[in-house]
Amino acid sequence: MTQDKPSCLLTCEVLWDCFPDRELLGGATLNVAYHLHQLETRSILLSSVGRDRLGELALRQIRDEWGCDTRFIRTLDDAPTGTVTVTLDDRGEPSYEVGTPAAWDQIDIPAEAAAMRPEAFVFGSVALRSGHNRRSFADFLESYDGLRCFDANLRPPHNSVEMVLEWARRADFLKMNGEELDVLGRAAGCGDGDPESKLNALAGMSGVNTICVTRAEEPAVMLWQGAVFHGETFPVEVVDAVGGGDAFFASMIDSLLHPPFDPAGALRRATALGSWVVSRRGAQPPYDGSQPR
């Protein structure tokens, strides 16, 4: 796009985490969109919501509170806005029930969005659970020549290793966590090696030359053009672990879209932002000046 800020087209699972006492807007790629918008990249969202109360609330928050571009979020009459019902047991341990079907199972990529020529396209494996989305994303990727960013989430019951590897081959930049690296590394023929060996095996199988792995308390690692970089940790008091990896992913995308790319610096910046997010309540904390720069 011809504008100062690079733009990013994101396919988002717009959903609500429904707790017994509250409802929180979420979805991994939606969280990425929020953080990109707060950084130096314009977020253009692709999704669907239902014609219901939660759909109206989601659009209002994304558009009016976050300031993101929602023109390509459709409102459907035949499917509800996505939800995840969170139930807490006697010990406070959560269990989750993902609503199916949901409006975000029907994400279209209209010609108007493609014509905007966004510098990056972000998609995640969770949204690939529906055939509609798989067809829509595949059709778009056939002719898209920008940066393709794929978030590999192996979340039961949508945790097909074969499908994740298939879609990883369409990406330029792949993000996952340490557990997912173990699983995908094993599928790539490196089950017992160190992270470097698993990254190289996965790159060899998928053809992706930029892979980032978040590892909770351990430093993140990144493969970039054949070299492996190790991050550092930023000790914080964890208030809410949800969304830290999404902020990390957003920061890495932002760095890739603002050349020249410094892999070590980008890894440090992304780790610092993810650490800051988990020290706050919620996956989309306000950027109030306390965030790392």
Task: Mark where each language-model region is.
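Ribokinase/PfkB-type carbohydrate-kinase core domain
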Residues: 1-9, 70-71, 90-228, 261, ...
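Substrate-binding N-lobe of the ribokinase-like
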Residues: 8, 17-84, 88-93, 98-104
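Active-site beta-alpha turn of Rossmann-fold NAD(P)-dependent dehydrogenases/reductases
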Residues: 12
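Residues at secondary-structure transition points
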Residues: 23-27, 53, 193, 239, ...
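Short, basic and Ser/Thr-rich N-terminal targeting/leader segments
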Residues: 79-82, 216, 271
